[in-house]
Amino acid sequence: MSKFQHDVMLKIVKIIDLVMITIPFALCWELYYSYQVYAKFGWRGNWTMLGLFAVLFFLLGKVYDAFWMSLQRISELIYGQVLAAMATDGILYIVICLMSRRLCNILPGIAAIAGQVVMATLWAKCAHSWYFRTFPPQPTAVVYDVRHGLEKLINEYGLSKKYDVKMTLNVEECLNDLSLLDDMQSVFISGVHSHERNIILKYCVGQGINVFVIPRVGDVIMSGSQPMHMFHLPVLRVGRYMASPEYLFVKRLMDIVVSLVGLVILSPLFLITAIAVKSDGGPAFYKQVRLTKDGKQFEILKFRSMRVDAEKDGVARLSTGDKDDRITKVGHIICACRLDELPQLLNILKGDLSIVGPRPERPEIAAQYCEEMPEFALRLQAKAGLTGYAQVYGKYNTTPYDKLQMDLMYIAHPSLIEDLKIMLATVKILFMPESTEGVAEGATTAMGQETEE
């Protein structure tokens, strides 16, 4: 099957999904909400509302990976679909209330969401099953330089579930006989240096084989290069992260507005959480020194989730998640719901943090990272953030090297659109337990080393 046919079939399946998810909203609108608006809508107005719903659902669905049949589990598809539908319903409910000039009954909207959950479940199961029957996993080879991390790539990261991994080749084996790749439809290249990788790339492209490159830090830095012409030659200019003044101004304005609105809306939750933490013994808040842009130190403010003497020996440790006996009973709850992060809105308002940016690390842990990976200091080119690319698309226990690459990908391409996407995608991970997993038990220091007693 050609790529064109593949893409057309996928678009048809996505259109079916849009229609299925829109039907409950359409019934809700036609039977109830259309009669609540101040001015009666004609048929054009009704179709406009349905079109607005479909467009918003499609855009939010892309943010929440609601259509990614090839790489998402059925449960993840349903979760993304329902989240996108609920967000769209919420936006249009506000629009309807504004058009009605009053607060409308929310029960019909809840009924629509229930219908959308059923539709999303039905579509996800059918679409996922159809996809893998129609497009079985492609025969795939993995070419690697160092075997360390290969098992994680194939098994833990789910490569073997989506691709039919026929062989794993050391880069030397591959270069000795490139024809080994001839029967493959896809090749993953992991940790291979540029010279050897380019030889494999040229061969695969010539043979019409899809190539997926897991980049090194240098590749990520190069991705943000500026193409130009000098001396009658094509040149790529690579330099320090330099976002435009306009971008920085709008980003700071967005930080102020979002943090102020968040503090006002979440103030009741803020108060309840503070009382709950205080009742667990000890202060409600704790401050900790963190690093932001250019290595500047600041005190981050969080709700206390651990015992007061959690680091009485003075050793900086990462959390090991639910198994960490330093976390209090209330701490387990607020960490699972991310409520411990709420006071950071004050850091954002003050200007220490941004809404979106690399995770602010402790100086001691950052020093450990830099000792093993000098490139880690490149993260400090941008202001640290409450949420970020690595937090959204990785896990708490994703390797430091992988997190570094994710952060550098964000830094290399500053964009308000990307910031908005990350902010919206953050909602998705709030309710995903794996995103709050700690490091492995015993691996309590920054690089996964066990602390000496």
Feature names for model-found ranges:
Residues 1-24, 125-264, 437-453:
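N-terminal hydrophobic signal-anchor/signal peptide
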Residues 81-85, 137-152, 283-306:
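Membrane-cytosol interface motif
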Residues 218-219, 286-326, 386-405:
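Short, glycine-rich, amphipathic interfacial segments at transmembrane boundaries or analogous
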Residues 247-310, 347, 416, 422-453:
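A hydrophobic, helix-centered structural microdomain
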Residues 375-453:
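C-terminal terminal-structure detector
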Residues 1-132:
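Signature of alpha-helical transmembrane segments in polytopic membrane proteins
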Residues 320-383, 422-430:
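A short, structured surface patch at a secondary-structure boundary
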